[in-house]
């Protein structure tokens, strides 16, 4: 009755396409140890079991995780995907933009997230924004301000014994 054993069984069953058995095994793992990442994984499996629909329990799980941790990255990704699947592009955009705030520009997830945001904006008839452009500009300005604030200027005079050594 180990949590790790149930998780492994759940993942194997998911890989085999046995979503009902996977959801059951992940549920048993969660009964032994509450873990938000595992809850999100179970929500994905339940949605797969329901033909890709996040209605009902999968959506309730996502909302519960986001209530406990509004910055939970996997929950934000999944909430955006669930909203997009329901053609709620405004909600999808909101979740993905929240995720974008915490995903570093050099993350392997960044391009996928930027594409999802661009698609949602397009579906809503909003103008496209270059990926990471707004954040990069702010970062550049902040870096220049930090450098200016930490610069030191002055004049150094060496004694004649050290002049040849420097």
For the regions a language model picked out, list residue spans one by one.
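Beta-strand-rich domain onsets/edges
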Residues: 133-151
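TPR alpha-solenoid repeat register
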Residues: 5, 38-40, 75, 109, ...
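Alpha-helical linker/edge segments of TPR/alpha-solenoid repeat scaffolds
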Residues: 48-56, 117-137
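TPR/TPR-like (Sel1-like) alpha-helical repeat modules
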Residues: 30-31, 84-108, 115-122
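Residue-level recognition of tetratricopeptide repeat
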Residues: 2, 11, 35-36, 44, 72, 81-84, 106, 119
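A short, amphipathic beta-strand motif
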Residues: 152-158
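Alpha-helical adaptor scaffolds
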Residues: 8-69
């Amino acid at each position: 009755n180990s949590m790790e054993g149930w998780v492994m069984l759940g993942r194997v069953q998911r890989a085999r396409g046995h979503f009902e058995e996977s959801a059951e095994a992940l549920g048993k793992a969660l009964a032994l140890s509450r873990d938000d990442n595992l809850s999100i994984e179970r929500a994905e499996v339940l949605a797969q079991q329901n033909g890709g629909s996040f209605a009902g329990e999968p959506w309730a799980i996502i909302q519960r995780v986001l209530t406990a941790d509004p910055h939970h990255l996997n929950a934000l990704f999944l909430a955006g995907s669930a909203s997009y699947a329901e053609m709620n592009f405004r909600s999808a955009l909101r979740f993905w933009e929240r995720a974008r705030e915490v995903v570093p520009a050099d993350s392997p997830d960044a391009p996928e997230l930027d594409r999802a945001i661009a698609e949602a904006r397009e579906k809503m008839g909003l103008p496209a924004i270059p990926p990471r452009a707004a954040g990069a500009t702010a970062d550049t300005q902040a870096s220049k301000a930090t450098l200016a604030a930490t610069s030191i200027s002055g004049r150094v005079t060496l004694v004649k014994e050290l002049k040849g050594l420097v």
